[in-house]
Swiss-Prot record:
Keywords: Cell junction, Cytoplasm, Cytoplasmic vesicle, Cytoskeleton, Golgi apparatus, GTPase activation, Membrane. GO terms for molecular function: GTPase activator activity. The lineage of its organism: Eukaryota, Metazoa, Chordata, Craniata, Vertebrata. The gene is arhgap21-a. InterPro entries: PDZ, PDZ_6, PDZ_sf, PH-like_dom_sf, PH_domain, Rho_GTPase_activation_prot, RhoGAP_dom. This is Rho GTPase-activating protein 21-A. It comes from Xenopus laevis (African clawed frog).
């Protein structure tokens, strides 16, 4: 349209030529489309482009969208076409009724790369011609047929989307499902005969005036000349705008009602001055011109002359303004849009006087144009209703709803009103919903138009802005009253408002020349923006001084509306400036435009201020419209009456903006309007192009700029009911233009606040009456087809559907009939609100634009009204992007659309609900106490929820809604079931853009029904809803992420919690409505939730609820059915594999998605509470798993959940039936045969088991493939899953112990050979033998035979063991600490001790490879073994030790793998046995050997054992990556010097094995803790393992491991120290103590590793068990140290005596030795005492410095903590504690001279050889010495021993309780480093252990210093996790 030439149209008398000129002016082409079908010329826009497509096999590569634009009823009945034709042929134009719905067809989608794409066809291009054949008048199917029937080439003439007025105007509707922008050329749409019904009375009035084109000499005439104004005589083919003074009833037409007929050949819209102006003029009907069809009209509008032809010649200012509008179009290209508006823009500009403008220039003649009614002349009908009915019948058989609305309105409205209105209609027939005469002062009668017409009250605007036919129809029906609003909207929309140049003629008639401010395509495109322009336009129309009016309008303009940059305050002074070419400044220009007529200026003040200025405001700021203002305009009809006559100040005050708009009248008002206009201008900036169509138009355009406001503020059309009398806007427009200057002025002067108040009052009245909204609702009902109406509707926004409904119910809705209606500002209120929120408006439009206008209108009205209310009542309404007024739209909004009755239907759903607001408008959460639950009667209407205290008769519907009602807009809302917000049941959460609410329904069905209804109503506007929903969803996601980051455990614990991610509250709420257990991330949460839900609970439904609420938090509901504990075939199946349980599928996928790089995945336990909660939720038959729930964020919980699932299977995955077969098959010696047998057995599994196993093994293989990252090698995974998958239903301890290696190996093999096992190629020979050997199988499988005899003894442990074996879930961190656990540990230790003894008797030469970790262990073990063996030959007990080693290795690998829990038990028992047992080396080594399996240090009793143990410890340390190996080495070395050393070696070896086993099973710290192994820790670990089996989560150690830090427990710390010191003491005293200690550490570590708790035991800084925690980086790092240490210790073991080792230990622990110096000589009694103490300490697990041991323990614990080890398990070994104390003493003394350490070592030496000396005594002495800081260097033997022991003891020296923890820690940490210091050999050993790297003491200390096994160098102490823990 911008290209439209501003050709001066011929005299108005020559409509046709002006029309054509106009079209040419606008487009530079004939505006045939707009002008009339006969003038089917290109658009006035730059014009259609031709696209040639060649057919391909895929077709032409594009799809079309159908958008039917229904001409307004008024247009049809008024025969706007006829009028246009008549104007061209004077009323002989095609009858409006001939106007058929215009099928606008535009490109929906272009296939990329297709012919269309290549040809440049774009989505949104409107199809104008197909192969040269116009699509206008053709149905969609016909067009499709044309295209499909085309030859290989298809030639399309398309209007680019950006230039397609229909789409621009109906941007919202066009893309709604029911509203496609008309894609055909508007020119094809037959120009509706001018719908200008010259009102007999107002015939000369406004309509005629505006239509009359002033002499071409006049500025207006010039504008017209530039833009031919189509007078009745001038009948452009497309559309022309004729301003016809619509004589309202003389009374009402205080001002001549100028109805500008925008005559589009296709659509004749009488541009009634915006309802503001024209509303009174009685015909919104004139708007009947379909907005969509308006395109032609718009093009026609280009004809300024028509505008000029406005009937009122009196106005000094030529109507040229209208013409300028056309030019504006040209300039802004908006004109093009106006054409798309159908008659509005162009018609407004070129509006032939409809009948009159074309027929006769005289203002009065606008009615005269016989065509206005085309077939139906409103004048011929006594009542508007009749007219509308007939017209509808003729036109289209108008939409049902429209008809109903019209009928209702007509019925309610008085004939007089309609007659009065009719003239306006006449003017506005073509495009104007109602012409000014329709709207004009016949406000009441005008109100009689159909509500929809009322709604379309601003016919001019609407005309200019193509509306859906329904809108047009509505406008026509409601035109008189709504004209203003509609015109307004249209103006606002148009941006180029055809400024209704309303000149108040001397007779008081105003010429309303709608100068179309350049309504830009964009504006056109976005109905909202355009509508504000329309509003501005209407405002300008309404205000005599458009220029000024825009200003006031601006003030009214909604803030949301952008004021076009050009749109400056439309100053009344600009009345004449209207001519000025600059459209956007046009706000003032518009004022000028309005001012063009002096009368107009005056009148504009009232009218303009009311109509026009609101228009501007509405347009510009319909937002500003002060919603009240627009709404006032909406109610304008009433106000309009008032305006017309009294222009009720209040009404106009709403319109005060309008008043302000009348520039001349009230400059201040203008200022406001200017503001608003700016908004409008912003909206209409695009429109502005249209604004400047003609020079004068340009001037006017400046004024019009308001109208062009980019932001199309939906001017709230007064609901017809609301303003039964012409809407204020009508009044303001028409009266302002025509008659009431003073009144307008008065109104204008009302401040926005006053207007708002008035508006609010009106709304209230409307609510009260229930009828006030009727008119408004209709007016506000957005037409689906017409974006304008929606915008108008938005303007009117407050008119709720209920109002519409009430209209149907009551005559009040009729604008004409109910002048008071204006009092109800509802429609007015939010129209601009809607505009403010384009998004809202679109949604509303979409909602409204649901094909059925009435519905959409209804909803729109409701929406807008609601919005207005909300806007007035609550600022949040705007936020609500939701049109709150939309409530009226029923769930079946479509049905509502279908019929008026639907429109008037009450509510979609209503009923009592408990309601609580969760967040305030500011997004702040509201506590229940502040806003408790309240029972409210909730009515769902359209897109709004009305909350009432009690059920009210819904007479007023939403319009009747009382102030007390709370309105919640639901457009774009998110609604979901709330589980976390409250404990209440059946609660659903409604989240709007700004607030959150909870509603409690009576039952689930009711809740679901509400949710469905709200979703349906809230999503009526797909586009906007999607946008709003996206915003909300994004907001929720952000909140969710915040919540997750802040509290990952705060997810809703609802069984489903399916939408938690969307829950904004979730972050804030911890309670669940159900009172169901929260995801037990923490019990605290649940209590918090309970607290939160208190208010929710406040209205408890029943005692049961209370009971449930109170009970649930504390007790778990029994799991019934569902997923866990049921057979595989009963589990909910995965979506893609019916044989795989859903839980398995989900967990595996989540782990693969997020956990492949998670260290220790499946090893690290998850939160037991969370797991339990998830299990409960899943057991509730929740097949829909919301993996977005934060509960599914914790990978450890997910992995534990998976393990728990398999653990709880009634029939294990490998089935009870085949369990023994699998075990036997695994024991097949031939690897190939073994694999084949296993495969055969697997294939024999039931389908569910087979598929699940296949799926799981594939998953585990995937995990193992990422072992580099997650450290979970097949063996580690096998350790975790073996006992879980390969088991029997009954937890058989014997099976667990005996079959654990098999279980591990089977699973490991499955993982490694998954492809082979589950491939169909059974013939393939398994390649696993070598591979497995190389990987894990090469490692010895732990031999658990020695454990079996003790199984019975350890009655407590079976479950624990089985749990640990399961290791799926670990016991709670404190599990070891429990007295029961302690006891079970004791039992385990005893049994393990005995088993260890037996095992020692049965030496195993070669460990069996069980898993990768075992391999690692074996590697270390072998290394150590070689060393140990080297030592062993030196040792007496070499054989014995070797056996022990072999056994230990086998046991450690096999047992550890198979029975970590058992091993733990064994270790614990061994330790306890050792502790209890005499220092006899044999017993201890034996005991230690089983611990070997678990902990290599377990064998400290014999010197021989000690070296072995040292070796084992080294190995274990290597395996565990902890200090254990060092400690064990230290112990072993210390043992070495003694005879026991070989055994110790064996024990050490065993310890290493145990450690490795442990490490294998529990990736964490078994090795680390090996030195610190303690019988108690072991037992607890066994228990924890057992528990872990029962519980979902893995043990703490695993968690610690997952954290990447050595997992330690207090017991472990104790164990470390104990192991070290104990081993040392045992080695020295009995050489067995330390090994046992180490063994304990290992055992403990092993169990903990198994469980995850063991890891803590590995606490010795040597957590490096790479094997144990291959997965753990820490463990690997530590393993390196361990290896070094192990090697060193091994070396020391090999060659050095226990004394050397002892020295090494001393050296490493030199600082501590100070304290322990006194205890240099361990005494056996002391040893036993130490054991006792240790037991005591164990019982006292948490005692800090018990006997000084506690303090050391504490220190060790600190050290471990320093190492980031959080978990505290009960300290397991009292012996260790004592030793820990010693160790602490060493640590303390470590700083002291190494001499002292040497002394201590020396003291210890005597003990070392005999091992009779108890380490405890020695440590005590050392401690004393430490305190005295006397340390005697120990011999190299002792150095080595101490080196080894030091490492061990660094882990757990127990004797020096007094030693400071820091020293202990230091000693522990430096153990490795000290060891190197001790001696080269010891250093090597330590280096092997990894100590050498860390050990300073080794290097720093002399061998003598290191000789003190209990002394750890500061480094060792620091390194020692135990110390850190302490």
């Amino acid at each position: 349209m911008a290209t439209r030439r501003a050709i001066v149209p011929e005299q108005q008398q020559e409509p046709s030529s002006p029309a054509s000129e106009i079209s040419k002016n606008k487009d530079g082409q004939e505006q045939s489309e707009m002008v009339s079908p006969m003038e089917e010329e290109g658009f006035c826009w730059p014009g259609p482009k031709s696209v040639a497509l060649r057919r391909t096999s895929d077709g032409f590569g594009f799809t079309l969208r159908h958008f039917i634009v229904y001409p307004p009823e008024s247009a049809v009945h008024t025969s706007i076409k006829d009028e246009e034709n008549g104007n061209r042929g004077v009323n002989t134009g095609r009858p409006r009724n001939k106007l058929e719905p215009m099928d606008t067809i535009f490109v929906k989608q272009v296939k990329e790369g297709g012919p269309a794409h290549e040809a440049g066809l774009c989505t949104g291009d409107r199809i104008i011609k197909v192969n040269g054949e116009s699509v206008i008048g053709k149905t969609y199917s016909q067009v499709i047929a044309l295209i499909q029937n085309s030859d290989s080439t298809l030639e399309l003439s398309v209007m680019p989307k950006d230039e397609d007025i229909l789409q621009l105007a109906y941007s919202q509707d066009a893309y709604l499902k029911g509203n496609d922008s008309y894609s055909g050329n508007a020119h094809h749409i037959p120009e509706p005969p001018p719908l200008c019904y010259p009102r007999i009375k107002p015939a000369a009035s406004v309509m005629a005036q505006p239509v009359e084109v002033p002499p071409s000499g006049t500025s207006l005439a010039k504008q017209q000349s530039s833009r031919p104004v189509r007078t009745a005589t001038t009948q452009p083919d497309r559309s022309y705008r004729v301003e016809i003074q619509v004589p309202p009833s003389p009374t009402e037409l205080v001002k001549s009602n100028t109805a500008v007929c925008v005559c589009n050949e296709a659509v004749r819209t009488v541009l009634v001055p915006s309802e503001k102006v024209v509303d009174l003029s009685s015909n919104r009907t004139n708007r009947a011109g379909p907005l969509h069809r308006t395109e032609e009209v718009r093009y026609g509008l280009a004809d300024p002359s028509i505008l000029k032809r406005t009937t009122s010649p009196t106005s000094s200012i030529p109507h040229v303004q209208m013409v300028p509008t056309a030019r504006q179009f040209d300039n802004a290209g908006v004109i093009g849009k106006p054409p798309s508006y159908g008659g509005h823009a162009e018609n407004m500009f070129s509006t032939r006087p409809t009948a009159q403008a074309e027929g006769s220039p005289s203002p009065t003649n606008h009615y005269s144009s016989p065509g206005p009614h085309q077939q139906i002349d409103w004048r011929n009908y006594k009542t508007y209703k009749e007219y509308i009915d007939n017209r509808r019948m003729q036109m289209y058989g108008c939409r049902t709803i429209q008809e109903r609305l019209d009928s209702l309105k007509a019925a309610s409205q008085t004939t007089t009103d309609y007659n009065q209105m009719l003239p306006n209609h006449f003017s506005g027939q073509s495009r104007r919903r109602s012409t000014s005469h329709d709207r004009v002062q016949q406000s009441v009668q005008m109100r009689q138009r159909s509500v929809s017409q009322e709604r379309l009250e601003d016919p001019v605007l609407m005309k200019e802005w193509p509306r859906s036919a329904s809108q047009d129809t509505l406008s026509s029906a409601v035109a008189s009253r709504n004209h203003r609003s509609e015109s307004w909207d249209y103006h606002a929309r148009k941006g180029d408002f055809d400024q209704f140049i309303v000149e108040t003629q001397s007779n008081g008639e105003r010429k309303h020349n709608y100068k179309w401010s350049g309504f830009t395509e964009q504006d056109d495109r976005r109905g909202i923006t355009e509508r504000p322009r329309q509003h501005s336009f209407h405002m300008s129309l309404r205000s005599p001084n458009f220029t000024m009016a825009p200003v006031p309008y601006t003030s009214f303009a909604h803030p949301l509306q952008k004021v076009h940059p050009d749109v400056k305050t439309i100053q009344p002074t600009r009345q004449n400036s209207y001519r000025s070419p600059h459209p956007r400044p046009a706000v003032s220009d518009r004022s000028g435009f309005a001012v063009s007529k002096s009368n107009s200026v005056k009148i504009p003040t009232p009218c303009a201020s009311k109509s026009y200025s609101p228009s501007v405001r509405s347009d510009d700021g319909i937002v500003i419209d002060q919603k009240p203002v627009n709404y006032m305009h909406v109610s304008g009809p009433q106000n309009f009456q008032r305006k017309t006559q009294t222009e009720s100040a209040s009404g106009f005050q709403l319109d005060s903006v309008k008043t302000s708009m009348s520039a001349s009248s009230s400059p201040p008002a203008n200022t406001k309007p200017a503001k608003q206009v700016k908004h409008s201008t912003a909206t209409s900036q695009n429109v502005d192009v249209k604004k400047t169509p003609s020079p004068e138009a340009n001037a006017g355009d400046s004024d019009a700029v308001l109208t062009p406001v980019d932001q199309v503020v939906l001017r709230e059309k007064p609901s017809p009911g609301q303003q039964t009398s012409p809407p204020i806007r009508q009044q303001s427009y028409i009266f302002a233009v025509n008659e009431q200057e003073g009144v307008s002025d008065t109104t204008c002067w009302l401040p926005n606040d006053a207007r708002r108040e008035v508006h609010i009052k009106r709304i209230e009245q409307r609510k009260a009456s229930g009828s006030n909204s009727p008119g408004n609702s209709l007016a506000s009902i957005p037409f689906i087809d017409e974006p304008t109406s929606p915008s108008i509707d938005h303007e009117i926004g407050n008119i709720p559907a209920s109002a519409v409904i009430s209209i149907s119910e009551q005559p009040l809705p009729t604008i004409t009939t109910v002048p008071p209606s204006p009092t109800s500002p509802v429609p007015l209120m939010r129209r601009h609100f809607s505009h403010d929120h384009d998004s809202i408006r679109p949604s509303i439009l979409e909602v409204n634009s649901k094909t059925e206008r009435s519905k959409s209108c209804d909803e729109g009205l409701d929406d807008y009204k609601e919005e207005g209310k909300l806007g007035l009542k609550q600022g949040s309404s705007l936020k609500g992007v939701q049109a709150r007024e939309n409530v009226p739209s029923s769930e079946d909004s479509e049905s509502r659309k279908d019929s008026s009755s639907d429109v008037f239907s009450d509510s979609n759903k209503e009923g009592f609900l408990y309601f609580r607001q969760v967040t305030t408008e500011k997004g702040k959460r509201v506590s229940g106490s502040i806003r408790p639950w309240k029972q409210m009667y909730v009515v769902l209407r359209g897109s709004a929820l009305y909350l009432q205290k009690d059920k009210k008769e819904q007479t007023g519907h939403s319009s009747a809604q009382s102030d007390e009602e709370q309105l919640i807009g639901i457009n774009g809302c998110l609604i979901d079931i709330s589980y976390s917000e409250t404990k209440r049941k059946h609660v659903f959460r409604l989240t709007t853009s700004d607030r959150e609410f909870l509603f409690q329904a009576e039952d689930r069905d009711d809740m679901l029904a509400w949710i469905k209804a709200i979703q349906e109503n809230g999503n009526l506007n797909d586009e906007q809803t999607d946008q709003a929903s996206r915003v909300l969803i994004s907001k929720r996601i952000k909140e969710y992420n915040t919540m997750m980051s802040s509290a990952s455990n705060k997810s809703e614990q609802s069984p489903k919690a399916p939408r938690q991610t969307l829950s904004i509250r979730q972050p804030f709420r911890a309670t669940r409505p159900d009172g169901k257990l929260q995801s037990p991330h923490s019990p605290k949460q649940e209590s918090e939730r309970r607290l939160f839900s208190k208010d929710d609970i406040s209205p408890p439904k029943d005692k049961g609820s209370w009971r449930r609420i109170m009970k649930n938090p504390f007790e778990k509901k029994p799991i019934t059915g569902g997923t866990f504990g049921v057979r595989l075939d009963d589990c909910p199946p995965a979506h893609n594999n019916k044989y795989v349980p859903l839980i398995v599928d989900v967990c595996c996928k989540l782990v693969e998605e997020r956990g492949l790089e998670a260290t220790g995945i499946y090893r690290v336990p998850g939160n037991n509470a969370a797991i339990s909660s998830m299990q409960e939720d899943l057991n509730k038959a929740n097949t829909d798993i919301d993996i977005q729930d934060d509960k599914w964020r914790d990978l450890n919980v997910i992995s534990s959940l998976l393990k728990s699932f398999f653990r709880k299977l009634p029939d294990p995955l490998f089935t009870n039936e085949k369990y023994n077969d699998f075990i036997e098959a695994n024991r097949t010696e031939d690897p190939v045969e073994r694999l084949k047998t296993l495969k055969r057995l697997i294939l024999d599994l039931p389908d569910h088991h087979y598929e699940t196993l296949k799926y799981l093994s594939a998953h585990l293989k995937t995990v193992a493939d990422n072992a580099e990252l997650n450290k979970m090698e097949p063996r580690n995974l096998a350790i975790v899953f073996g006992p879980t998958l390969v088991r029997t239903s009954e937890d058989n301890m014997t099976h667990m112990v005996t079959h654990m290696p098999d279980q591990y190996k089977i699973v490991e093999t499955l993982i490694q050979k998954h492809d082979w096992f589950f491939s169909d190629e059974s013939a393939d020979e398994p390649i696993t033998t070598v591979h497995e050997e190389s990987t894990v199988e090469s490692q010895p499988v732990p031999n658990i035979d020695h454990l079996l005899p003790n199984i019975g003894r350890t009655g407590l442990s079976p479950g624990d063991v089985s749990d640990s074996a399961t290791s799926d879930s670990a016991k709670p961190k404190g599990s070891w600490g429990s007295g029961k656990d302690q006891y079970s540990r004791e039992l385990l230790v005893s049994s393990l001790f005995a088993a260890a003894s037996r095992k020692r008797k049965k030496p195993k030469d070669k460990p069996q490879p069980s898993s990768s970790e075992d391999e690692l262990d074996n590697v270390f073990y072998q290394k150590e073994l070689s060393q140990v063996e080297f030592q062993i030959p030196d040792k007496q007990n070499v054989d014995k030790d070797a056996d022990l080693k072999a056994k230990a290795n086998a046991l450690s690998f096999k047992d550890a793998d198979n029975i970590k829990g058992t091993n733990i038990i064994t270790e614990d028992k061994l330790e306890s046995d050792i502790m209890h047992s005499e220092s006899t080396s044999p017993c201890l080594p034996k005991l230690l050997e089983p611990p070997k399996e678990n902990h290599r240090l377990q064998v400290p009793s014999d010197d021989k054992t000690i070296p072995q143990i040292s070796f084992q410890m080294e190995e274990s340390m290597s395996d565990s990556g902890t200090m254990l190996s060092n400690s064990s080495q230290a112990s072993a070395q210390r043992s070495k010097p003694k005879v026991v050393s070989p055994e110790f070696k064996g024990h050490d070896f065993l310890t290493a094995d145990v450690s490795s086993i442990t490490s294998d099973y529990s990736t964490t710290s078994s090795t680390i803790y090996m030195t610190g192994l303690d019988p108690n820790p072991i037992s607890p670990e066994v228990q924890s393992v057992a528990e872990s089996k029962g519980e979902e989560a893995d043990d703490e150690r695993s968690e610690l491991i997952s954290e990447g830090r050595p997992v330690e427990t207090d017991s472990e710390n104790d164990f470390h120290i104990f192991a070290s010191s104990l081993a040392f003491n045992r080695q020295h005293r009995s050489k067995e103590e330390d090994p046992p200690r180490n063994v304990q550490a290992n055992a403990e570590g092993s169990p903990s590793c198994t469980e995850g708790s063991i890891t803590p035991r590995l606490d010795t800084r040597r957590f490096s068990s790479h094997k144990l925690i291959e997965c753990d980086t820490l463990s690997r790092k530590k393993s390196v140290r361990l290896k070094t240490d192990s090697e060193c210790s091994a070396e020391s073991k090999n060659e050095e005596t226990l004394s050397d080792a002892h020295e090494v230990m001393k050296k490493s622990r030199s600082p501590i030795n100070v304290d322990t110096t006194a205890n240099n000589e361990p005494e056996e009694p002391a040893w036993r005492i130490k054991i006792t103490d240790r037991l005591k300490l164990r019982l006292k697990a948490s005692a800090d410095d018990m006997f000084g041991i506690g303090s050391q323990k504490a220190h060790a614990a600190e050290t471990r903590k320093k190492k980031n080890i959080r978990r505290r398990h009960t300290l397991g070994g009292q012996r260790d504690f004592a030793e820990i104390s010693v160790l602490n003493a060493w640590k303390i003394n470590e700083p002291s001279s190494k001499e002292v350490e040497l002394s201590a070592v020396d003291r210890l030496k005597p003990k070392c050889p005999s091992q009779d000396l108890s380490i405890s005594d020695w440590l005590a002495r050392e401690r004393l010495r430490t305190s005295t800081s006397e340390l005697s260097t120990v011999e190299p033997e002792e150095k080595h021993i101490s080196e080894t022991t030091g490492q061990k003891e660094s882990v757990s020296p127990s004797p020096p309780p007094s030693s400071s923890p820091s020293q202990v820690s230091t000693a522990d940490i430096p153990t490795g480093s000290e060891s190197p210091s001790l001696g080269t050999a010891p250093q090597s050993d330590d280096q092997m252990n990894g100590d050498s790297f860390q050990s300073k003491n080794k290097n720093n200390f002399s061998p003598a210093v290191d000789a003190h096994p209990h002394k750890l160098s500061g480094t060792q102490v620091v390194r020692s996790r135990f110390y850190q823990y302490l």
